[in-house]
Regions:
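N-terminal pre-domain/capping segments
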Residues: 1-91
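Active-site acidic/histidine proton-transfer and metal-coordination neighborhood
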Residues: 67-121
């Protein structure tokens, strides 16, 4: 049975007894795409050389979506993630931030949308 879906496995959560690069190779050998988290701690050239299909990665280094200052930082570091995503052939950056303001309450969507629209440009 074939599927139109790409199934991906988070390399941060499986085969934890293996070094990260070996996890990626194993996931790829099993026919799955790969997701990664903090790219700043990874050998990007080695990951790209595995031939694995990367479908998602954390798309920022620091920042948060719950306030102006944090969102500006998130967007600034998201820009640094773009060339890494290109190097991996990865089409998706996950900008989850915290989704909360500094009081621990859900942030207002009307605040978040303009922030994310700036990044899309």
């Amino acid at each position: 049975m074939s599927s139109n879906f790409t199934l991906a496995v988070c390399s941060e959560m499986v085969f934890l007894d293996l070094p990260h690069i070996e996890r990626v190779k194993k996931i790829h050998s099993l026919g799955f795409a790969v997701e990664i988290w903090d790219w700043t701690q990874k050998d990007i050239a080695a990951l790209a050389a595995t031939g694995a299909k990367f479908t998602s990665m954390t798309g920022y280094i620091t920042g948060r979506l719950g306030d102006q200052e944090g969102a500006a930082e998130l967007l600034r570091t998201a820009e640094q993630s773009i060339p890494i995503a290109h190097a991996l052939g990865n089409p998706s950056l996950n900008l989850h931030g915290t989704g909360l303001d500094n009081k621990g309450l859900p942030a207002q969507p009307c605040f978040l949308c303009p922030m994310l629209q700036r990044f899309r440009k």
